[in-house]
A protein has these predicted regions:
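Solvent-exposed, polar/charged alpha-helical surfaces in well-ordered, non-transmembrane soluble domains
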Residues: 22, 115-119, 123, 150, ...
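Acidic-and-aromatic substrate-binding clefts and catalytic sites of carbohydrate-active enzymes
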Residues: 7, 107-109, 137-140
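Aromatic-rich peripheral "rim/lid" segments of glycoside hydrolase catalytic domains that contact
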Residues: 135-174
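Soluble or luminal CAZymes and related metallo-dependent hydrolases
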Residues: 15-23, 106-113, 148
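Substrate-binding surface in catalytic domains of secreted glycosidases
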Residues: 1-78
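Hydrophobic, secondary-structure "cap" segments at the distal end of domains
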Residues: 65-126
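Conserved, mostly hydrophobic/aromatic
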Residues: 41, 121, 129
Length: 174
């Protein structure tokens, strides 16, 4: 079950979150007939870039006229050196990122939202997770960092390697 594209993306008419956690919780009822231990949830290493629209705004034509797909690797420099700012949407449980002039925005996962999703997946007994596209957050090895890294995928790997906690898990829906 893909956690991404639960919005209009660039194929619809309203600019909204790509991977809203709230949408996963909402859509869960549709999967009820299938044993959740047989379901893997898809996580996205890409998002959507929009220009000339505000989040939730309906476009006067196809969203593809206002935006495009953007990989995490393409997105990251905007935040690191481009002055883009994050605004968390507590209702959707994910963030938007805005350009300095607020004429552009991106909806994309970040390490915090990715961590919340994998915690929810494991707490609720799903089979696991998979990515679309795995390489979109790839960090090539360097002399200083000789191992391949992934900005988002490594968050999931780290969580899965942690010993099970005895404390109650607040990520669980049931």
């Amino acid at each position: 079950v893909m956690a991404d594209d639960m919005c209009d993306g660039i194929g619809g008419s309203t600019a909204s979150h790509n991977t809203a956690m709230a949408k996963l919780r909402e859509k869960r009822a549709h999967w009820a007939p299938v044993d959740k231990r047989q379901l893997c949830l898809g996580l996205a290493n890409y998002g959507f870039y929009y220009k000339g629209l505000k989040p939730g705004e309906k476009a006067d034509g196809p969203l593809s006229r206002y935006g495009s797909y953007i990989t995490y690797r393409e997105f990251l420099p905007r935040v690191e050196t481009g002055g883009w700012t994050e605004e968390y949407d507590p209702e959707a449980e994910v963030s938007y990122y805005f350009s300095p002039d607020r004429e552009e925005f991106v909806t994309i996962e970040n390490p915090v939202s990715m961590r919340r999703k994998i915690e929810w997946i494991t707490a609720n007994g799903f089979r696991g997770a998979f990515w679309w596209e795995f390489h979109h957050d790839y960090v090539a090895p360097t002399a200083e960092q000789p191992a391949v890294r992934h900005h988002l995928n490594d968050v999931v790997t780290a969580h899965l390697k942690e010993p099970a906690a005895d404390a109650p898990n607040t990520a669980k829906d049931e």
